[in-house]
Regions:
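Conserved P-loop
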Residues: 270-345, 411-432
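Hydrophobic anchor at the beta1->P-loop junction of P-loop NTPases
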Residues: 259-261
């Protein structure tokens, strides 16, 4: 039996292509949704851009038929605009002057009319609660939602390696079938590896020493940059060795790196350190510059209305980047700065020369950036559509680094399963162009107090 989905405005704003995601079912767009889209189409940023995309998609439908009667979609479904049910009664506490409540009126009207399987689709949790109170089935938009299996993928695994092939591994690597895992009962079994997955190998006759490798074309090969010290920084744990390998590898082999983890696991710090190494100390000129973006939930949509230049507008967001730069520059024992003023002058020089540039996320959209080391910090506050726009715009020689913690979401309508960082990790898993790693809680490099607080609070 076909279902009838009533679509809220926020679904189309987050995913303007959402009409394509409901198979052969019926879709209803309340008239108030059109009004809201019309009010948003001139807004700066992704909200306005997505509103315009959604409107254009509806216009294409209008050109094919009558939207009041219903227009067939390519997937076999039917979309229509609903202008009726203005007289449907709601509880006194739900005024019909509010857009959300007018959407509820459409849902209730369709249900009272006898249409079966009426489902409201909205990103708004409160609206879903109100719908349930009124006996209306409501769901989140799940087309971009990742599964438990996707969420649990960390980009790293452990395996045992026979002692007699350890030397072979160190020299040229071993095939994946040569290593194995062991369950709690001591039964050995093969492992299903993912391309570019990092591997901690334990020789089966000596569990004290471990070897670090990466899956490449059916083999597990040793890390190439294990002994590197980008801008004088040395790895302090296994996760940082894996981060270093992914970041130091050139954009021709690793154009996309995804690093997830708690605050304090050196995601941003290490990404900046490698970027500085590549731009300052690489004579081949691998990258022209470092660009850092840091999306913010309350900021991106309103940047056009804030006073000042672009850099003045985004300066508050970039303070954590400055903090990491100070730590990186002052960590070099051969170039230790005498005082804070000298260190600040050096950082100012780096920005003035354009070696590091900071950009608002909206200013990246639509550009094709070449030979750039592009860091997207706090990427969990991006939508899947935003991440797609960034990755698919990567120019030749550009390396994109997505950093963040899926459990620290600040943006409305996103959660740990629907944010852009998790979505990119799911979609790019297994791609030879994507390297990803999730840092462990014990790999947090903040103070002992901070580490203890993470465990206790």
């Amino acid at each position: 039996m076909k279902k009838t989905y009533v679509i809220d405005t926020n679904v189309l704003i987050q995913a303007p292509y959402a009409l394509e995601c409901f198979e052969d079912n019926n879709l209803v767009i309340p008239l108030v949704v059109l009004e809201e889209l019309d009010g948003m189409k001139k807004v700066d940023g992704d909200k306005g851009a997505n509103a315009r995309k959604a409107v254009r998609m509806l216009e294409q439908c209008r050109n094919r038929g009558n939207l009041l009667e219903g227009v067939a979609l390519e997937n076999g479904g039917l979309v229509r605009i609903e202008k009726n049910f203005v007289d449907v009664e709601l509880p006194n506490d739900l005024p019909d002057s509010k857009s959300d409540n007018r959407i509820l009126m459409v849902c209730k009207g369709l249900k009272d009319k006898g249409e079966e399987q009426i489902i409201l689709v909205t990103k708004d949790i409160v609206l879903r609660l109100k719908a349930q109170i009124m006996g209306i089935r409501a769901e989140d938009f799940t087309a971009e939602q990742i599964t438990d299996e996707d969420a649990n993928y960390t980009g790293r695994t452990e395996a045992y390696i026979p002692e007699d092939i350890v030397k072979t591994f160190k020299k040229s690597g071993v095939i994946c079938d040569d290593v194995y895992a062991s369950d709690d009962d001591g039964v050995n079994h093969k492992i299903s590896f993912v391309e570019n997955e990092f591997v901690i190998l334990k020789p089966d006759q000596s569990s004290k020493k471990t070897l670090l490798g990466r899956v490449k074309n059916g083999k597990i090969v040793p890390l190439e940059y294990k002994k590197s010290k980008p801008y004088g920084i040395s790895p302090r744990n296994v996760g940082q060795y894996f981060i270093q390998e992914a970041l130091m590898t050139g954009a021709d082999k690793a154009p996309l790196v995804i690093i997830k983890g708690l605050a304090g696991t050196a995601k941003t710090f290490y990404s900046l350190a490698v970027g500085m190494e590549k731009v300052f100390n690489n004579p081949t000129g691998e990258y022209r510059r470092i660009i850092v973006c840091r999306p913010n939930a309350q900021f991106d949509d309103d940047i056009g209305f804030l006073p000042g230049s672009e850099q003045e507008k985004i300066a508050p967001l970039m303070r954590p980047i400055i903090d990491n730069l100070e730590q990186i520059l002052d960590s070099d024992e051969n170039k230790r700065y005498d005082d804070e003023i000298e260190l600040a002058d050096k950082i100012d020089e780096i920005f003035e020369r354009g070696i590091i540039q900071t950009e608002a996320l909206n200013f990246i959209r639509g550009r094709s950036i070449e030979k750039t080391y592009l860091i997207i910090d706090e990427a969990q506050n991006m939508t899947p559509n935003q991440v797609k726009g960034i990755i698919t715009r990567a120019g030749k020689g550009t390396k994109i680094i997505l950093l963040g913690d899926p459990n620290q979401i600040d943006k409305p309508f996103l959660d740990e399963r629907t944010n852009g960082l998790s979505y990119a990790a799911k979609c790019m898993k297994g791609s030879k162009y994507c390297w990803q790693i999730t840092m462990k809680q014990e790999e947090c490099e903040r103070s002992e107090l901070a580490t203890d607080a993470i465990n206790r609070l």
